[in-house]
Amino acid sequence: MIQKGSIKARLMIGIAAVIVVAAACSSAPGASTAPGGSGAASGAKYTIGFSNPGGVGNGWREAMLCSAKAQAVKAGNVTKVTIIHRDTDAPGQLSDIRTLIAQGVNAIIINPAGPDALNPAIAEAIAAGITVIAVDASVTAPGAYNLSNDQEQYAYLGASWLFKAMGDKGAVVYMRGIAGHPADTDRDTGFQRALKEHPGITIAATTVTKWDPATATQQINDVISAGTKFDGIWTSGVDSNIVDALKAAGHPYVPIVGADNAGFVTQLLAADGPKGAAVTNPASIGGAGVTLALQILSGQKPAATTVHVTPELWSNTDDAGKAKLTAAADPSLPKTWPLGLTIDGWTTYTKAELIACKGPGDA
C-alpha cells in the first residue's frame, strides 16, 4: 500500500471526495501528434470537471487523476478543475455528472461506469454547451469524444502471449476488472478472441476483482485453497499482488500477464521472478483528456470522435521485451502505479510534476 505522505496521501481523494483546484498560469501544451495542436486559445479561460466512479485506492486511477491535475497546471488556461472521485455505480455517476453540469464547467472528463448508462447526463451536458470526453473507456452518447487505450487489443495481446507461454494447453485463471465497465467489456472481447484461437486452453476460474488489489489477493488465495489446478493467470492490471500471493502460499509460479505497473515490472525483471508479460495501459490518458478538452474548446476538433492509444506487450522471455522492461522500470514509484507516465503529443508535464499531484492553485 502507499504510505501516508506518499502520492496517495498527496492526491487526497477519498470516498465521496470532491477536490477543487484553482487557477494556474504557464505555457500551453504542444500536441504534435494529437489532433488539432495545442488547444490553447488566446485569452480564453476554462473550467474542467472530472468524474471517476471507482477505484479509490487503485494506483492506476490515482495516477490518472494526478495526470489530469498536472496537465491542467501546464495548460495555463484552466481556472478551475473539479474532481469527483468515489466508489459508485452508473446511477451515482449520473448524479456526479449532473453536479458538474450545475457548476457550469466548460468540459467534463469521465472515466465511464458504463457505455450507455451515462447517456442521459451526457446529453444534458452537451445540450448545455459542455464538451464531454470519456477516457480509459468509451461511451456511445452522440456528441461525446472517446480517448483511451485500445482495451480490446490490450487483452488480446496479453492473452495470446499467455496461451503460447502455457504451450497452448492447460487452464487459466481469468481475473477481470469491474463488471459492466466498458474497458472490462472490451477486454473480455479481446480475451475471448484469443481464447478461440487457442482451443487447448480452458478457464480454471473467473473472478471479478473490481480492480482492487485486496479483493484480487483474496480471490487468488481462494482459488489456491480450493485446490483448483491452473497453469497460467491473466490479470486485468492487478498483478504484483497476485505474484506476492503465489509466493506467500508456496504455490509454484505460472506464466502471468499484467499491466505495466511498477511493482509487476520489477518482479518480471527479478532473477527469481515469474515468467510473464506486461501490457501497456497509460494512466496519463487523464492528462491527455485535459489536452483534448482544451483543443475542442478552442475550436480544434479532432477528425474522429474516438481516438485509441495502441498498447505494447513487454515479456521477460525475449531480449526485446526484457530491454523494454528494463528501460521502463522505476522503483521510485508506488508498485501499483503504471509506468506510462506521459503520452507523447498529449501530455507536457514532467515526472516530478505528475508525482507531486498538484493541480492549479494547490499549495
Question: What are the residue ranges of the model-derived segments?
Answer:
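Bacterial lipoprotein signal-peptidase II cleavage site
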Residues: 25-35
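An alpha-beta-alpha
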Residues: 50-57, 61-70, 156-201, 205-206, ...
